[in-house]
Amino acid sequence: MLRIVSHLAEAQAELERICDRTHDDAVVHREASVREIVQAVQRRGDAALIEFTQEFDGFALQAENLRVSGAELDAAYQQIPKELLDAIRLAHHQIEAFHRQRVPKSWVQFGADGEVLGKRYTPVDRAGLYVPGGRAAYPSTVLMNAVPAKVAGVERVVITTPPGPDGSLNPAVLVAAQEAGIEEIYRVGGAQAIAALAYGTATIPKVDVISGPGNIYVTLAKKLVYGTVGIDSLAGPSEVLIIADRSANPRWVAADLLAQAEHDPLAAAILITPDLELATQVGFEVERQLQDHPRRLVTEKAIAHYGLAIVVDSLETAVKLSNQFAPEHLELEVEDPWALVEQVRHAGAIFLGSLTPEAIGDYVAGPNHTLPTSGAARYASALSVETFLKSSSLIEYTAASLQRVARAVDVLATAEGLESHAESVRLRQQSLDR
């Protein structure tokens, strides 16, 4: 089932096809539908949320139960096993420890004539986190979005997540939110939740930044509201690219490919190796492990359409292909991964060595698992504390420093036809010359 390609031109064409897998005519149609939803929420607020939640989630939402109650939050702790609570707490600790090390510090520097230049970082006032529902519950998504926002110092962080047909929310999601210090949670999902966060309703506050993954409707809604609010990214389906040599364990490689494919029918799982025998063995292992897979239909579809093994002449060629694809997750299951990593230019996250499956990064390693997809790793990075911060330049000039640059400002402003710019400096210089 895992197709093997050994011609370079064909491999490049396949990687391009996989990278563009969400760019189809259906997206254009969906964008029109999403625009209608967003505009309805902007106009009608809570009433539109109630209507769309009934239509899409099958739950008769009321304005008074949009927000999750304190009783529900308390009860969630009784609804999950202790082992899961312990795992959530371990993940929270690891993620927080990593992100605290990544907080940029404000700074100033002093020039020769006493001028002061610097940069000051401040958090946004409000952040809205989207946590998907649907096929699975994602407490890890809560932590990966909530922890950077809290570490950044955002004063008000709220969560939206879609309810089940009975209005319930997954207790693990509610527990993860509370462990991260968030108790303001709203039971609404989809494009309508993004619109509510962007424009505000009588119940849900307007925020400054929206983060969190979702389906195509959520992604399109984030695209539409960008500019009204900041967003983390426009995430596409998940993907892993594994570079492996003959030292790799084919069972482990197959398991890592399937771990990505089980996310979504559009997920991509790619192996690049200079070893044809390894590629063949991995293909056999993929089929064997699929037989009893609990998410076989989803996983099988992803492997059939976006699973691929590419056989190349060298590891150097493998890295070149990877850089062209710019994967969300890159695993280096090779004998000396640190020797190879220096050649990697574009990847959302890099997992070095056979004992570092991508799942470690999904849950407990600490670095963020919200990563650029669909080739965006060429220019974008993981969600971080900086997603919830903005910087302001600090500039203070003295008499001496103003005198030193005044003529240059005058000349440049005059050349651009901005006379008042030039005059604003001339007046000060004249005052200093008296």
From Swiss-Prot:
Binds 1 zinc ion per subunit. It catalyses: L-histidinol + 2 NAD(+) + H2O = L-histidine + 2 NADH + 3 H(+). SUPFAM superfamilies: ALDH-like. Substrate binds at residues 238, 260, 263, 329, 362, 416, 421. InterPro entries: Ald_DH/histidinol_DH, Histidinol_DH_CS, Histidinol_DH_monofunct, Hstdl_DH. Keywords: Amino-acid biosynthesis, Histidine biosynthesis, Metal-binding, NAD, Oxidoreductase, Zinc. GO terms for molecular function: histidinol dehydrogenase activity; NAD binding; zinc ion binding. Catalyzes the sequential NAD-dependent oxidations of L-histidinol to L-histidinaldehyde and then to L-histidine. This is Histidinol dehydrogenase. It comes from Synechococcus sp. (strain ATCC 27144 / PCC 6301 / SAUG 1402/1). The gene is hisD.
